[in-house]
Amino acid sequence: MTDYLDAVIVEHNPSQKKIDRAVIWLHGLGASGHDFEPVVPQLGLSDDMAVRFIFPHAPKRAVTVNGGMVMPAWYDILEMSLERKIDVAQIEASSKQIKDLVRREIEQGVAPEHIVIAGFSQGGAVAYHVALGYPERLAGLMTLSTYLATNDSIDYSTANKDMPILIEHGSHDPVVPIILGEQAKQLLSDKGYDVTYHTYPMAHQVCMPQIQNIGQWLNSILA
């Protein structure tokens, strides 16, 4: 029996139809699944869509760069250099837990091509690992204020070679420097992926114009 991550569930379904779209959205280090819950009604999603948002809670673990403090974390960060030394085994374990959530959505009747994987900061690094290696075509990948931590260990799936990817970053992010977002965008573009890249005049956060843009993107790829 699969032990699923606890998650906050928000459904956008004005027409009261059967849910047939899903967005699995991962929070950042030290946060929780409640972090992006308030964003859903601000996205301006089409009333014709029936979308389930799944905001999982990360497991609690010691984080080396925070003095070994135990907090919600998708993986341990060993060093905050531009290379971002991380515990790869933990990011792979977290990725498996997210893939379990994807499979649960499929079992509930949501086709994989109608499932978006999204993440902010540390959650975005896991989202990259999950979506780029997923064996079935997904609706899209959205990564916010993050970095591609596991390029060398991802088994890139041909099923998602044409998957829309949205990368967004703050221009003066002091936590995840914008160069890391740019590197991810360039690497994936060079591999032939369909990447849309936006920056905003902000730090390590999200802003209202960005939320509106995310909503437009979701309306487009989930239509």
Task: List the model feature ranges, each with a label.
Residues 2-114:
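Serine-hydrolase catalytic machinery in alpha/beta-hydrolase-like enzymes
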Residues 21, 163-164:
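Alpha/beta-hydrolase fold active-site loops
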Residues 36-41, 177-187:
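Short alpha-helix in the alpha/beta-hydrolase fold that links the catalytic acid
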Residues 43-49, 109-110, 134-137, 190-193, ...:
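Short helix-capping segments at alpha-helix termini
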Residues 57, 118, 144-145, 168, ...:
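Alpha/beta-hydrolase-fold catalytic nucleophile elbow
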Residues 106, 113-160:
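Primarily recognizes the serine-hydrolase "nucleophile elbow" in alpha/beta-hydrolase
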Residues 166, 182-223:
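C-terminal catalytic histidine-bearing segment of alpha/beta-hydrolase fold enzymes
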Residues 167-169, 173:
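Short beta-strand/loop motif that positions the catalytic acidic residue
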